[in-house]
Amino acid sequence: MNNYKRNIIVTGGAGFIGSHVVRLMVNKYPDYRIINLDKLTYAGNLANLHDVEDKPNYVFVHADICDFETIQKILADYNVDGIIHLAAESHVDRSIKDPFTFARTNVMGTLSLLQAAKEYWESLPEGYEGKRFYHISTDEVYGALEITDSEGIESQFTTKASSEHHHAYGKDFFLETTNYNPHSPYSASKASSDHFVRAFHDTYGMPTIVTNCSNNYGPYQFPEKLIPLFINNIRHRRQLPVYGKGENVRDWLYVEDHARAIDLIFHQGKVADTYNIGGFNEWKNIDIVRVLIKTVDRLLGNPEGTSLDLITHVTDRKGHDMRYAIDSRKLQRELGWEPSLQFEEGIERTVRWYLDNQEWMDNVTSGAYQHYYDDMYKNR
């Protein structure tokens, strides 16, 4: 037995979003034991948590969520009463090349966790009382929205963090009630896992919650994703491979704001409910690239526009969804959450972090990463 008030597993806790959730909860809840369960694939990095690794309420467990028997043992050994499930393969390009890995991790891994939690919690005298299975998903399961105004219209959403660039590229937004229509192997695998989570509530009464978030950005993101990749490329004077014309639109959410939302929903969200988590920030990809160029050049002391010549338009991604835009007013209305940072402020923090932590970047971009990068972009 232990003296901790709660014992919570965060799967994928060494990854990008997961490490921010682990850090927040370890520091905020010293009476909780936070178990970071991670397989440590290419995107998992324990260096992301160097500042909490010696905390008494932090535990790292090296395990694969698809290993059902191991998961069963971990749940019992640590008397787990909460699971925050972030472990997933998440890069669309990788899913196009290798959909089987995405199905294994995102679908079968989620099912393994659900079944292990079901069996363990049902074996306890109190059953599901005080338990919670929180599954983090993506807005990509909803499909794509049309761009109905290429120049942007004034957004109907207003928060204290609304930026000067506060506009939308259409009047439609993803709601929690939007029908699923995934277009990539990645989003199809996440949609399937979402359905399994809801089915375990409907069938067995498991206390589950699902959230769907927009694009995250911030420190510790593996540089296969646009923002850290381009920051690093600008710094090293490498090409900036922009898919197609760069007109695709995404909503952006600062990762620490997402971690705050996860903490809030885990504790106060309604069982069996769904919450969208968005940043109220729609940007065209090409405009993001220009903001990154301007910010990195300024912080490196380069004349404005120095790196604009690095922009290289490459063959578009297969099945590239045109626009994602998320309506998270339900979360704002019911639980009082909203983003804390204007996008421009978040980008400034993010760029500064990557420039100040070049050793971290060098470590994660060595070896196999370079082969992946060449394979992805060299012949496009």
PLM features per residue range, with description:
Residues 1-216, 256, 266, 285, ...:
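N-terminal Rossmann-like NAD(P)+-binding domain of SDR-like oxidoreductases, especially those catalyzing
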Residues 2-8, 24, 34, 63, ...:
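C-terminal substrate-binding subdomain of Rossmann-fold SDR/epimerase-dehydratase oxidoreductases
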Residues 220:
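Conserved GTPase G-domain signal focused on the G5
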